[in-house]
Design a protein with these regions (language model features):
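Structural beta->alpha junctions
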Residues: 18, 166-183
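Amphipathic alpha-helical segments
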Residues: 178-199
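Short, glycine-rich, amphipathic interfacial segments at transmembrane boundaries or analogous
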Residues: 1-16, 105
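Alpha-helical transmembrane helix bundles of large polytopic membrane transport and channel proteins
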Residues: 31-136
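Periplasmic N-terminal gating module of Gram-negative TonB-dependent outer-membrane receptors
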Residues: 21-35
Length: 214
């Protein structure tokens, strides 16, 4: 797990520390992080089962950065910089495959055909899909892609995130986070702290200092 300390120089009231901990876990703090790192986009390799992931520590996990989401496979890398869907398509699985002319996106009902490196707006049975595919594995190699709801994504973050007061009535809030990829977890945690700092500045809080360490 990776951790960071946020020091509160505004008294040691337990209620204050609890309030700040709740703020850190709130949508107000987490939503900017989710949007910046495209955390609502989920990629997976259907050729790798759950048992394979448990057995192998070398199984690739998706990487989320401001420029997009990527996932390495044995036949190449998937890179997605944009994936927005209508409400009806949220949390629904789609499959992406490379084709001779670009890519095919399907949910089992609708098939959408597009070009690599170009933004597309598709109109499906249940709404619109906006997607930019920058790269995909070799022809025919499938990639599962899902656009999660904001609630689902923030709940997952909070499951992995620990926010506790360090010691007894110290006024110092300690953050730690678990994840399969240490570099990815570090980036998410750092952005959560930065979002918290930004929110404090917007609240006009000049009494709070923050330190982050890994």
């Amino acid at each position: 797990a990776l951790g960071a300390d946020i020091s509160e120089l505004i008294g040691s009231e337990v209620s204050k520390a609890q309030a700040e901990a709740e703020l850190i876990r709130s949508r107000m703090i987490l939503e900017p992080v989710v949007n910046l790192l495209h955390l609502r986009i989920r990629l997976s390799d259907p050729n790798i089962g759950a048992l394979d992931r448990i057995k192998s520590n070398s199984t690739d996990t998706q990487i989320n950065k401001p420029e997009g989401v990527s996932l390495k496979t044995e036949d190449g890398e998937a890179k997605i910089s944009q994936f927005n869907v209508s409400q009806e398509y949220l949390n629904q699985p789609f499959t992406l495959t490379r084709s001779a002319t670009g890519f095919v996106l399907t949910n089992g009902f609708d098939d959408f055909k597009g070009q690599i490196g170009k933004g597309h707006l598709f109109k499906g049975t249940d709404g619109q899909i906006q997607i930019t595919v920058n790269d995909l594995p070799a022809d025919g190699y499938p990639i599962n892609i899902t656009k999660q709801s904001l609630q689902t994504t923030t709940e997952q973050i909070n499951t992995d995130l620990s926010v506790v007061e360090k010691g007894k009535q110290t006024g110092i809030i300690q953050l730690s986070m678990t994840g399969a990829n240490q570099q990815q977890t570090s980036l998410i945690l750092k952005q959560i702290v930065l979002s918290y700092i930004d929110q404090n500045q917007s609240r006009g809080s000049e009494e709070t200092t923050k330190t982050i360490s890994f």
